[in-house]
Design a protein with these regions (language model features):
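Non-catalytic helical/linker scaffolds that mediate oligomerization, partner binding
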Residues: 1-479
């Protein structure tokens, strides 16, 4: 892989849409600094998504890059159905009905949702929020079957197919809908690198999707999206079984009090950092750049604070999917990330205790030692050999200031690691001896400009190299 000699360690995930879905536009975004492209399965046809998948892979080949693909499943999003006249006005104090599972058109006195379980899930006094909280209803009564009597607390224009949030209720909808399962099969068939499960509420939700993946004979990694109170309550068990976490601040900011979201973000990031699991911060990071060529000061600060919190990646949604300035968004985000990383020593050298009881104790100790050694010697790089990726995830966990370069004989891993903090990957399969591998790594990193003559770098790997065992070796080398 041909890498940029200077690069941001915090990765960028960009959503693809009409503003960015051609070979030329995707190529521009990759050159500006996108690490992973998100395919939003709430929108678009399979034909649209397959075109993007094929185009990104063609660009990776043409540009000698390893940009990854993240499939984002829609999840059990509760929505209204169609609305009379394209929109009806409801006013505060109105008493109306919310009807479940009906295909009839909503009116100002009778709103209809396609979700069958709503009347069973709510109880008197519960909040019901529509359109990201713009409209608030209070439950007066429910027949526990099809109809809910509600009072309008904050009214407004009700538009078709807007989302419904139930922040006070235990939602009984399954973690994956039939649509999600079919969409997942499509993603697995086309070998996406990551799949994001929306509205993850408990560990069993992750186990369910992982079983589908395993039964398909795939090893696709799962991102759990935290966007409900249940997800927050069960965060520890979710982190334990997920491969990565997304702080999905859009629905989360509706489901819990908006003022609680910043601290929830910090809490989730801290737990993911300690567990060595990648964490993505998403939603409205540079929202104003949908229509403006520059971000607001608040948006720049939001991106900077996500980096300072320890996010592995920051994500863009409408900004790159439908916005007028997708390339400028990436350029601005890269600039902010680099500014923070170049001026924040507290970002680096995060030392976590090694668990002596863990089956990975030896490898963990070696990789921790490699990061300590890099800090103490001022090494410019840490290199690792891995087939499954464990070495890369562990090295990133310690947030070394030295650049992390991973060499692997597993081509699929190259794009998977595009999401992981600080990691840049190279394909390498000339496994002859440890000495020859170190010499090859030195050659690759010097010819690509990542090391200069005389630079120290730290090698980690397993000896003998042909056994492809766990990491058991640390070596200081000179370029």
């Amino acid at each position: 892989m041909e890498n940029r000699p200077a690069f941001n360690k915090t990765k960028i995930v960009a959503t693809v849409g009409p503003a960015s879905n051609t070979y030329e536009r995707l190529g521009i975004l990759m050159r500006e600094g996108v690490d992973v492209f998100r395919l939003n399965f709430s929108h678009g046809s399979y034909e649209d998504h397959l075109s993007v998948i094929n185009t990104v892979r063609r660009l990776n080949k043409d540009m000698r890059t390893s940009v990854g693909l993240l499939q984002d499943l829609q999840g059990p999003k509760i929505r209204l159905g169609e609305v009379e006249g394209g929109g009806v006005e409801i006013k505060g104090g109105d008493r109306i009905k919310l009807v479940c599972g009906e295909q009839e058109i909503s009116t100002a006195t009778r709103l209809c949702t396609i979700y069958l379980g709503l009347a069973r899930d709510v109880k008197p006094g519960d909040q019901i929020l529509i359109d990201d909280g713009k409209i608030e209803l209070k439950v007066l009564a429910t027949d526990r079957d099809k109809e809910v009597d509600v009072e309008v607390v904050y009214g407004g224009l009700v538009k078709p197919r807007k989302g419904i949030n139930l922040p006070d209720s235990e939602v009984s909808a399954p973690s994956m809908t039939e649509k999600d399962i079919e969409d997942l099969k499509f993603g697995l068939e086309h070998d996406v690198d990551w799949v994001a499960l929306s509205f993850a509420r408990k560990a069993d939700d992750i186990r369910f999707i992982k079983k589908i993946i395993a039964d398909s004979g795939k090893k696709t990694r799962v991102v759990a999206k935290i966007e409900t109170p249940d997800g927050l309550r069960n965060i520890d068990e979710i982190i334990a079984v997920a491969d990565a976490i997304m702080v999905a601040r859009g629905d989360l900011g509706v489901e819990v009090k908006m003022e609680e979201v910043p601290m929830a973000q910090k809490m989730i990031i801290a737990k993911c950092n300690a567990a060595g699991k990648p964490v993505i911060v998403a939603t409205q990071m540079m929202e104003s750049m949908i229509t403006a060529p520059r971000p607001t000061r608040a948006e720049t600060s939001d991106v900077a604070n996500a980096v300072l919190d320890g996010a592995d990646a920051v994500m863009l949604s409408a900004e790159t999917a439908v916005g007028a300035y997708p390339a400028e968004v990436i350029r601005s985000m890269v600039g902010t990330i680099l500014s923070v990383e170049n001026n924040s020593p507290q970002l680096f050298h995060r030392w976590w205790p090694v668990n002596a009881a863990a089956p990975t104790f030896m490898a963990d100790s070696v990789l921790s030692a490699a990061c300590h050694l890099a800090k103490n010697t001022g090494a410019k790089a840490i290199t690792g050999m891995t087939h499954h990726g464990y070495t890369a995830f562990q090295l990133a966990k310690y947030r070394p200031k030295a650049n992390i370069f991973i060499f692997t004989d597993n081509r699929e891993l190259l794009t998977v690691l595009s999401l992981v903090w600080g990691v840049r990957s190279f394909y390498y399969d000339r496994l002859i001896s440890t000495d020859s591998t170190v010499a090859d790594i030195r050659y690759v990193l010097t010819t690509t400009g990542h090391l200069e003559t005389g630079d120290l770098f730290i090698n980690t790997g397993s000896m003998p190299i042909l056994d492809k065992g766990t990491a058991n070796m640390v070596k200081v080398s000179v370029a």
